[in-house]
């Protein structure tokens, strides 16, 4: 310990400066600790415990005050700093942990969403494939049905064109015969005037009802117009009745002779008289 000599007076000697070395400070700290700490230690007690020569109560009091200030203020500031650091560290760690958890959760959600999207895409692809397969199957069925309908329709076409088996088959008569039959089929009962008028008509090859020669047709007309005697109230009068058409195409003389039968109720003399009378009337008309 070094003391400055300040002069002869005692007041100046009591206020001489003291340099606190490391050893002296250690002894001061031990004395304060023995006395119960900086709060309980008193300058007199510290001075007595230290027992250093030249050390005054003023020196101990001043150093004790500085020690107390240095003891409490740095401790409080350090504690405050430590608390702040601890809180800030906790906050940072909490933030880091929460942010890490949030990031992890976000990544998990993103992966889940991607997985679901992938599954949906796969389902859509499978559905598209099924739709295409179903369309091809339906198209094949339609083509098969059209082919079968075409095959069944081909043999059925001739069957529909045939005549109904229930209906009678058409006759083999030619249209010429039908026409000639219609044209040459007059009433079976003709009057004498109509038969006589037929003699006056010229016979030409173009006649539809006259196919043979003029001589043959004349003979046929004479044979066809045989008189038939009908018994009346006054006597017997000749009545000419034609049972068949006078002129028919395609028929021979023998047919007309066999068909026209004369019925007489009187003897042959009456028939001859009627023929003469008929020939006379025919000659007058010609």
Curated annotation (Swiss-Prot):
InterPro entries: Homeodomain-like_sf (IPR009057), Myb_CC_LHEQLE (IPR025756), Myb_dom (IPR017930), Myb_dom_plants (IPR006447), PHR1-like (IPR046955), SANT/Myb (IPR001005). Its main location: nucleus. One of its GO terms (biological process) is regulation of DNA-templated transcription. Residues 43-68 bind DNA. It holds the Pfam family Myb_DNA-binding. Residues 104-124 form a coiled coil. Residues 74-97, 152-227 are annotated as: Disordered. A motif (LHEQLE) lies at residues 117-122. Keywords: Coiled coil, DNA-binding, Nucleus, Transcription, Transcription regulation. It is found in: Nucleus. PANTHER family: MYB FAMILY TRANSCRIPTION FACTOR PHL11, MYB FAMILY TRANSCRIPTION FACTOR PHL7-LIKE ISOFORM X2. Belongs to the MYB-CC family. This is Myb family transcription factor PHL7. It comes from Arabidopsis thaliana (Mouse-ear cress). The gene is PHL7.
């Amino acid at each position: 310990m070094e003391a400055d000599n300040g002069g002869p007076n005692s007041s100046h000697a009591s206020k001489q400066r003291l340099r606190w070395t490391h050893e002296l400070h250690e002894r001061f700290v031990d004395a304060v600790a023995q006395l119960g700490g900086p709060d309980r230690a008193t300058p007199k007690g510290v001075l007595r415990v230290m027992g250093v020569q030249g050390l005054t109560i003023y020196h101990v009091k001043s150093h004790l005050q500085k020690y107390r200030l240095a003891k409490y203020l740095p401790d409080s500031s350090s504690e405050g700093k430590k608390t702040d650091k601890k809180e800030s560290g906790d906050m940072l760690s909490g933030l880091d942990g929460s942010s890490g958890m949030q990031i992890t959760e976000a990544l998990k959600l993103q992966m889940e969403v991607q997985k679901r999207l992938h599954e949906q895409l796969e389902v859509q692809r499978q559905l598209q494939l099924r739709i295409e397969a179903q369309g091809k199957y339906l198209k094949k069925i339609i083509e098969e049905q059209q082919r079968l309908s075409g095959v069944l329709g081909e043999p059925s076409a001739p069957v529909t064109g045939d005549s109904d088996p229930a209906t009678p088959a058409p006759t083999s008569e030619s249209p010429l015969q039908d026409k000639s039959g219609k044209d040459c089929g007059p009433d079976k009962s003709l009057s004498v005037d109509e038969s006589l008028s037929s003699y006056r008509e010229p016979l030409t090859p173009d006649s539809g009802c006259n196919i043979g020669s003029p001589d043959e047709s004349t003979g046929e007309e004479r044979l066809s117009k045989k008189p038939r005697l009908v018994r009346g109230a006054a006597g017997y009068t000749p009545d000419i009745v034609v049972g068949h058409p006078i002129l028919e195409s395609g028929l021979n003389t023998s047919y007309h002779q066999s068909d026209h039968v004369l019925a007489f109720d009187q003897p042959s003399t009456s028939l001859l008289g009627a023929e003469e009378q008929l020939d006379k009337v025919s000659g007058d008309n010609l």
